Each structure stands twice: as C-alpha cells, then as structure tokens.
Amino acid sequence: MALLIAGPTASGKSALALRLAETCNGVVINTDSMQLYRDLHVLTARPTQEEEHQAPHVLFGSVDGRINYSVALWLDQARIALDEAQGQGRMPIFVGGTGLYFKALTQGLSDIPSVPDSIRADLRRHAEGCSTPELHRELAARDPEMAARLKPNDSQRILRALEVFVATGQSLAAFQNARSAPLLTMSEVLAVFLAPDRADLNRRIDRRFDTMLEQGALQEVERLGARGLDPSLPVMRAHGVPHLLRALRGEISLAEAADRGKLDTRHYAKRQFTFARHQLPDFAWRTPEEAETFFLSKLQRM
C-alpha cells in the first residue's frame, strides 16, 4: 500500500504529506521534477530542515542542476525508495506536482531511446529559425501520427517528437504505445489530486512567490546563474528562474520579474489540472480540506 498526493503547485501537498507521514509512520517520497534539484531550495518550496526532521523525506534536492533529469531516472530512484520504505515497515507517501511521474508510477513507462546530443543540438539550432507551427508541419510530413496527437503550439513536445524520429526513424507514438509494467497499480494505492478553489489557489501562488523572494529566491537564482549552465536545462527553466535572471542582468525590474513568475506559475497550475483530468483518471479529486479525512478514513477501513 502507498499514498499518492498529486495536485497543482501551492495547493498544500507537502503539508498534507507531512501530517500523514507523522500519523501513519510514513516516508515522504518526492514526486516533483523541480524539487529534485539541490540548486533550488527556496524557489521550488522544498521542505524545510525542520520538516525533514519531523518525518523521513527522500529524493528532495538529490540532483545537481547540470543533470537533464528524466522520468525514467526518477522511476528508478522511486523504485529504490519504495522498496526501502516497505522494508522498514513504513508507509510510502508519494507527493508532488509532476503528473508525468505519477502516470509513469501507476501506468508504466514508455521505453523511449535516448537521443544523441548531436542530433538534439542540430534540431534545436534548426528550431531557432522556425515558428512552432512550421515545426508542427515539418513533424506532420515526417510523423503524421505523432503530429496528430500534438497541438500546433506545443513547441517542446513537437521538438521532442522530431528528435526521436530523426534519431530512430520511428514514430514517438510507437514507443509510447509500448509501456512497461507500473511500479504500483491503482489497486495498491490511495491516490488523491488536490483540487482547491481556483481563485484561492491563484492568491496562494502570488503570496508564495512574494514569500520566496523574501526568503532569498533572488540570491538563490543568482548563484544558479553564476554556474553558467546551459539555459535549456530543466533547472534553468524552473518557474521564476528565467525572469529573475533577466532582473539580475538589469533587463527588467524585480517587480516585473515577480509578476511574470507569478503568471507563469498560475498557467502551470492550470496545466496541472488539465493533465490530471485526462491522464490520471483514477485519482480522487478532493479539496485540501477533504483530503486528509479521505486518506485516514480509507486507511481505517483496511
């Protein structure tokens, strides 16, 4: 048995996971692609040292920012964390905002081959001179099945599909259709997607961004920028990072950077709702206030 807590950013997932871990002798397992990176503690709202002392937390801040981490790498680490928790007689509690990680955990993972760096670099240079609709038309000419699955403005996924096709000569769809066995089936978990009121969530997002700035997010981003990492790396594209780097370079004001960071985060939260609705159909939607009662009542009946 394991507990799964998904949900949009700033919805109270981490606090709920900590309360459940204290109640159920649990281990909190990070299921958020940005909280993996040790470079961004404040800006990703990772658990504090005090919170980590209250209950075991694993896979938080465990990856260097220069690593282009993948869902496959996370799944390997999640398997180890799950085995260790169960071996210790503890309740595994997976918590985070990365829907793709939860999908891989409960539905299996497509075995997509890695793309050589040379091909990735060539295609990214090519993409710089093209609009996203043009890239989508190019994908449609090469891989019509995958192009039909993607929106014409989804630049990141279009480029990924092109990379796989150029590297393998096969459609990304073919790899996606062949999935490995899931690490946990839905019959082995209690899974919730936290669904707070949207207006309240937006206010929480804005307040939290201001709080993170007060707690040193700008200085954290300055240290990250000083590393000279490739701007295409995931850690360099975390919400708020590009705008705060521009503020540090004097290109925009800090106030404008904060406003843009908040807007990006609100848009991301909207996408998290959409992903869960379509890709995590078996997760129970509950408000943050309802979720703890849901878990505890279910556990008491088992």
UniProtKB/Swiss-Prot annotation:
<dbReference type="InterPro" id="IPR027417">
    <property type="entry name" value="P-loop_NTPase"/>
</dbReference>
<feature type="site" description="Interaction with substrate tRNA">
    <location>
        <position position="98"/>
    </location>
</feature>
<keyword id="KW-0808">Transferase</keyword>
<feature type="region of interest" description="Interaction with substrate tRNA">
    <location>
        <begin position="32"/>
        <end position="35"/>
    </location>
</feature>
<feature type="binding site">
    <location>
        <begin position="9"/>
        <end position="14"/>
    </location>
    <ligand>
        <name>substrate</name>
    </ligand>
</feature>
<comment type="subunit">
    <text>Monomer.</text>
</comment>
<comment type="function">
    <text>Catalyzes the transfer of a dimethylallyl group onto the adenine at position 37 in tRNAs that read codons beginning with uridine, leading to the formation of N6-(dimethylallyl)adenosine (i(6)A).</text>
</comment>
<keyword id="KW-0067">ATP-binding</keyword>
<comment type="similarity">
    <text>Belongs to the IPP transferase family.</text>
</comment>
<feature type="region of interest" description="Interaction with substrate tRNA">
    <location>
        <begin position="156"/>
        <end position="160"/>
    </location>
</feature>
<dbReference type="GO" id="GO:0052381">
    <property type="term" value="F:tRNA dimethylallyltransferase activity"/>
</dbReference>
<feature type="site" description="Interaction with substrate tRNA">
    <location>
        <position position="120"/>
    </location>
</feature>
<feature type="binding site">
    <location>
        <begin position="7"/>
        <end position="14"/>
    </location>
    <ligand>
        <name>ATP</name>
    </ligand>
</feature>
<dbReference type="InterPro" id="IPR018022">
    <property type="entry name" value="IPT"/>
</dbReference>
<dbReference type="Pfam" id="PF01715">
    <property type="entry name" value="IPPT"/>
</dbReference>
<protein>
    <recommendedName>
        <fullName>tRNA dimethylallyltransferase</fullName>
        <ecNumber>2.5.1.75</ecNumber>
    </recommendedName>
</protein>
<dbReference type="GO" id="GO:0006400">
    <property type="term" value="P:tRNA modification"/>
</dbReference>
<keyword id="KW-0460">Magnesium</keyword>
<keyword id="KW-0547">Nucleotide-binding</keyword>
<dbReference type="InterPro" id="IPR039657">
    <property type="entry name" value="Dimethylallyltransferase"/>
</dbReference>
<dbReference type="GO" id="GO:0005524">
    <property type="term" value="F:ATP binding"/>
</dbReference>
<keyword id="KW-0819">tRNA processing</keyword>
